């Protein structure tokens, strides 16, 4: 069982289709989401990133997560398993993340052989056996939309 603890969206209005190179919108969304949830970044056990495996998105995410001090939190992306389902990706990946919480295991980021970003991130390379208490789902979209959602295990 799990409970939605907090969720928020921010828009950096950066570009019609490309994410902000600075990660500002995602940084603001996650910061506000953590504050709303009443927890600190180091309370997070797991991050399900938007993770498109594109240069601009992955770099932007690594910058935002670095600024937030989330470099060591286990992180994965489900897109290699289910594809980029566009508007449904946040919902689909939230469900998969909640299933991870329930089963006590976090899936590896399929096909991630090289971490090609400038900031340190802790990409899950093999199935990770943990019982997450808090999980962060992030998503970024066209027009500068950035969302963050924190789920708590009950």
Regions found by a protein language model. Name each.
Residues 6-13, 51-53, 82, 140-141:
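Glycine-rich beta-alpha junction loops
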Residues 146-150:
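Short beta-strand scaffold segments in enzyme catalytic cores
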Residues 41-57, 72:
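Conserved beta-ketoacyl condensing-enzyme motif
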Residues 11, 46, 61, 80, ...:
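Glycine-rich phosphate/pyrophosphate-binding loop at beta-loop-alpha junctions
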Residues 1-3, 28-42, 63-81, 89-142, ...:
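Structural signature of cysteine-dependent C-C bond-forming condensing enzymes
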Residues 1-37, 45-46:
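Condensing-enzyme catalytic core mediating Claisen C-C bond formation in acyl metabolism
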Residues 14-22, 52-69, 87-92, 126:
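Short glycine/threonine-rich loop-to-helix capping motif typified by GTGT followed
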